[in-house]
């Protein structure tokens, strides 16, 4: 297949099932790759100004945003999933341990074309 044909026919939002670890072992969720605009949206939400007035990345805000955007099943933007909580990232932070959030966010990043090294760099 020609490169141009491959690019034209490519679905960059393909889905993938991942198995969770720890207390959630045995549970499978479906994630999807995020696109460039969604990456920028998640990163913008994670930028905080520190005490020195400098911008920094809040890793938990970034990871919970990536999880809210990149999870297909369950869909954390669906009000039926959220119950009484109205903000997807708040639901995620209330119902998942920090390590679980990081694990899922890293899987979404890897599925979006970032390797392990790029995931670490993106969080800096």
Where are these regions (language model features)?
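Generic detector of low-complexity/intrinsically disordered segments
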Residues: 5-8, 22, 26
């Amino acid at each position: 297949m020609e490169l141009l044909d491959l690019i034209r026919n490519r679905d960059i939002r393909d889905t993938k099932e991942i198995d969770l670890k720890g207390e959630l072992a045995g549970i499978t969720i479906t994630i999807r790759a995020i696109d460039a605009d969604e990456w920028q949206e998640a990163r913008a939400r994670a930028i905080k100004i520190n005490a020195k007035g400098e911008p920094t990345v809040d890793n938990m805000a970034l990871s919970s945003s990536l999880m809210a955007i990149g999870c297909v099943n369950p869909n954390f933007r669906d009000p039926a999933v959220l119950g009484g909580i109205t903000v997807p990232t708040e639901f995620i932070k209330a119902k998942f341990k920090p390590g679980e959030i990081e694990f899922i966010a890293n899987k979404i990043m890897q599925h979006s074309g970032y390797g392990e090294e790029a995931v670490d760099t993106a969080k800096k």
